[in-house]
Amino acid sequence: MNCEDQAVDLCKAIDLCNVSDNTISHPTPAEEILPRDGLQLMDGDQEEQDAAVLTRLKDVHLKDDALHTKNNGSIAVSADPVNGSAGDLQQSTVEEPLATKCSVGDVGDDGEMDIGVDLSLDENGVLEFEPTAQTQSEESASSCENSLISDTVIELHSQEPLEEHSVDVPSETVPAAATPVVEEAGIKHGLKRVTFPSDEDIVSGAVEPKDPWRHAQNVTVEEILNAYRQACQKLNCKPIPKVLKQTQDLKDLTQRNECLDLKGEKLDYKSCESLEEIFKRVQFKLVDLEQTNLDEDGASALFDMIEYYESATHLNISNNKHIGTRGWQAAAHMMRKTNSLQYLDARNTPLLDHSAPFVARALRISSSLTVLHLENSGISGRPLMLLATALKMNMNLRELYLAENKLNGLQDSAQLGNLLKFNYNIQILDLRNNHILDSGLAYVCEGLKEQRKGLVTLVLWNNQLTHNGMGYLAAALPFTQSLETLNLGHNAVGNEGVHKLKDGLISNRSILRLGLASTKLSCEGAVAIAEFIAESPRLLRLDMRENEIKTGGLMALSLAFKVNTSLLRLDLDREPKKETVKSFIETQRALLADIQNGCKRNFILAREKEETEQKMRLSASMAEIATEDQTHEEEEEEEASPLKKIEEETTDALKDATQESSEVSENQEPKDQESTPQDDSDSDTEDEETPTNTSLTSTSPIPIPAAADTSKTIPSTPPIASPAVISGITVTEASIVTPSSPGRCISVSSPGRGHKIFMVTRVESPPEQQQTSIAMLKSIQPSAITDIKAPSQTQNSTQPTEKSHAEKTPDAQQEDSVSTSTPSLDANIDQTQLTESVSEEEQKKAETLNNEADINEDANTGAPLPNGLKPEFALFEFEGAKPASCIMEHVSVTAELSCGQDLEELLLDASLETSRDAP
């Protein structure tokens, strides 16, 4: 067979093997002769495809026919790189031109072909191929990048045209293989690329959690009962009669019901599972599971339900000794996850070493739990250490009960002391019936010193304390500002311990309740406690039962009640103690009765004080100024009786004007300062309260401040047919504290806004001129209510007028200026003319007649002055020779100041003299 036939058969064989047209095609004449430059390596996918093509061309007897084809001649197709080996080609980053050639019958000296693949004809004339060396063919295939499919030129030693017998890769494969060598080398060295979708495409979907209370909407009691019965039937357990009855009694299913009481019921796992039909539809305030014989499975199921459905705010799991580790783990998960649980009672439920870490981890996270009962839970040692460490960071727990846990005085007490140093949120710490001892009390007191605003109640009942430990407690009490209840009952404190404790109790100002029951006290200790009672202004309750307190101690306690007004309850033994003298027994009974009466008295005082505080709070919320009708009704009710007495006192005082002083003030009913508060006012001196007994018209002292009063004011009322009251203004004559002083104090209360009260101080005229004024007063009609006093014509008349002007408030000055209208000014002019023409006595008579006419004219007109004052007030103060009313005093002061006097100095002197003369 010649070379031409073999080449034709090779092309047919490739076509029969379903080689695609993209792999083998006829090249152009130029491509047959010249090698193609710039040929790129194929990618990995193309290599696999080409390897599959070669595999389909293999025969089963490759190795046996290889030698035969070498002897008979073969067509060798080689694709050797020009510049180097296959290894050099892989490492090179620069593309090298490839030269491919096809030689027929070129065999080396050793009889082997220098290509990777041999194509030969077997005995039957079937074209076969076999790699000369399998390893060489694999290396050639990988290094040359499938050179058989790349640009291949077949050289034939024949005279036939080259274009009819050439095999080449078509030009369409060149762009596909034109990938940079750098990227191909990077992929081959294992550099992979990972891409992620955009943020919007990452989450393909979401599922909302199921609503735990989806079954509780529009549900009825019958539906709940039916669901519970069906659950019991499905679980093959009997319905609990107590559950059926309590469910039947449910009223409002939209709110939390009071209680689900399962106390004493034996709950196994199936019974607990059936309760889910109740919990998923109804919520409760308290779920009582006390002594229900819960095991690990049942407890876990119930706690998971309560956590998921938030079934309870208060949970009682006490007296369940078989909850186990899984039960406590579920309970801890419930405490950590639920937001509704506030109270957990786990007394008499063991919390052992392997369960304590779960509870500690739950308490470290600030959950909603505020009250935790762990009495008799066996938490001494490591469990207490874990709990105390966790509670240092807890911010919500308020009450911690650790009674009857056999806490010792070393390690456990040290943990409690450290807890008190760091946690300022615990308000109640109950350590009763433990073994704290005096050594442990020292640790607790170290932490107690840091509790300046946290701990309120500390119970150390029955902790084997003695008088030695009271020293630590007495040293800590002055530092505690929040401790209100201290219970030291059933400890051997003794008289010596009470003496040590007394100083600390007196220094402490926060203790309200003190428990000293059964502390081995006698009369000596009772005397020390009595000293504390007398010094304490806040103590409310004291328990001294089961102590040998006899006559001497009871006498000291009884005397202490004469000073103390705060102690409301003192617990003592009802029966008197045995005495050697029989009469002392009756004395003890009498003293006990006195102590009881003292408690009752303090209780009444406390109740009155509380009512007073309530009234003060109410008055603070009311309007500052009441309506005139309301105040008028209050005036008629409260002041009916004092008015008559005021009139009588005023009549007597007018007859003896030389030694009596007048006081113009509002009339108000005296009040008990301890039981009735004073109303608020707008006075600038609300805080100045100096009660003085200056009025003789009332049964109890009326509080009158030195400068301005804050007491209740009464608006003006219609004139009463009395010589003492005109237009709501009351004139009260009272004796002054210093009778030697000729001054007179007039207190005027304005019924307008602000309840202003001002003082007017005057100096009396000499006695001879006052007698003349009294004679003139008798000639005036009784209806004219005036106090006529002739002032001296010397400096004594000018100085009090200046004082009165200095003492007046702006409201009073405004009233005076308004009152200086035509009646008063006309009177002044007429009086001036009379002094020039008539004698002194005729002048006095004329002034008296003119003033009387002015009073009648003002009474007829009744034109009120500002703040409700009527013009009668303008005629209230005038004396003998010239009118001396407040208005005329204002005019005279102005005239005197124009003569060169300094106004500021006069006001200062007037205020100083007023402060001395005023009561």
UniProtKB/Swiss-Prot annotation:
Residues 626-716, 790-866 are annotated as: Disordered. LRR repeats lie at residues 340-361, 368-388, 396-417, 425-445, 454-474, 482-502. Residues 833-861 form a coiled coil. Keywords: Coiled coil, Leucine-rich repeat, Protein phosphatase inhibitor, Repeat. One of its GO terms (molecular function) is protein phosphatase inhibitor activity. It holds the Pfam family LRR_6. Residues 631-640, 677-690 have a biased composition (Acidic residues). Residues 641-658 have a biased composition (Basic and acidic residues). Belongs to the PPP1R37 family. This is Protein phosphatase 1 regulatory subunit 37.
